[in-house]
Amino acid sequence: MATVNQLVRKPRKRKVAKSDVPALQACPQRRGVCTRVYTTTPKKPNSALRKVCRVRLTNGFEVTSYIGGEGHNLQEHSVVLIRGGRVKDLPGVRYHTVRGSLDTSGVQNRKQGRSKYGTKRPKK
């Protein structure tokens, strides 16, 4: 425990919270251009081909972003919107592409949880 005199001489330091999504620079989303679209495999014990893309953001950052949902239309030079949110079994993937905005299409034939995948309400 510090004495009053010690605290007068040198006050307590505030802890600085480190951002989980530094490339967004305190913005909710960022726009970017796909530089590479590919699949990668997750860490043990999971097994799959996860769809990801490398994105050059408008602020100059280059990040890896996960493409959620079944099927996508992204290719090189597609303009995408990026939000925060990591993928636990893919090391280095700390961002998600927003489905249904800019060049990213929504997921086809999706009935539940549509808002998360940019899918319009189906006709009766």
Curated annotation (Swiss-Prot):
The modification 3-methylthioaspartic acid is found at D89. The lineage of its organism: Bacteria, Pseudomonadati, Pseudomonadota, Gammaproteobacteria, Oceanospirillales. Part of the 30S ribosomal subunit. Contacts proteins S8 and S17. May interact with IF1 in the 30S initiation complex. PANTHER family: 30S RIBOSOMAL PROTEIN S12 FAMILY MEMBER (PTHR11652). It comes from the Bacteria. PROSITE patterns: RIBOSOMAL_S12. The gene is rpsL. The keyword tRNA-binding applies. It holds the Pfam family Ribosom_S12_S23. Residues 1-22, 99-124 are annotated as: Disordered. GO terms for molecular function: rRNA binding; structural constituent of ribosome; tRNA binding. InterPro entries: NA-bd_OB-fold, Ribosomal_uS12, Ribosomal_uS12_bac. GO terms for biological process: translation. Belongs to the universal ribosomal protein uS12 family. It comes from Marinomonas sp. (strain MWYL1). Transmembrane segments: none annotated. CDD domains: Ribosomal_S12. This is Small ribosomal subunit protein uS12.
